[in-house]
Amino acid sequence: MSIWNKPISLEILNATSKNTLIEHLNIIYTEVTENSISATMPVCHFTHQPLGMLHGGASVVLAETLGSVAANFSVGEDAYCVGLDINANHVRAMREGLVTGTAVPLHIGVSTQVWQIEIKDEQGRLVCISRLTVAVKRSRPNQAKPVAEV
């Protein structure tokens, strides 16, 4: 059974990236299943840290992007989600190639959600494991919609 409470597709997801950090890092959504979202990000000069390896912050951007977007599509039209906490363990260095992140829910509650995001290299080896906690907020009448819904 699908966890999505709003229309979701790769076309919709990739359209939300326009003029954002997501677009700047060339993060591309690649798969939506009944309970997960995946995206890729290149490991290259604009995602490197000074030693020429994948910057941990870039991995966290990918993780938070996947978890936040997934959370926002899992709530109804009367709600939206905002990040409360994120952690990441960087377990493998990368110098070039493509990483793929996949977000799956660990908990979808009324007021909070917890998402696990695994980031792997092209050989399927774990590069980073992250956990994102979000708050579920209720929209008020006439309240501006989050960017992902505009």
Swiss-Prot record:
Q: Which domain of life is it from?
A: Bacteria
Q: What InterPro entries does UniProt report for this protein, alphabetically?
A: HotDog_dom_sf, PAAI_dom, Thioestr_dom
Single GO MF descriptor:
1,4-dihydroxy-2-naphthoyl-CoA thioesterase activity
Enzyme nomenclature, EC number = 3.1.2.-
Keywords associated with the record: Hydrolase
Hey, which family's this protein in?
Belongs to the thioesterase PaaI family.
Q: What is this protein called?
A: Putative esterase VC_A0580
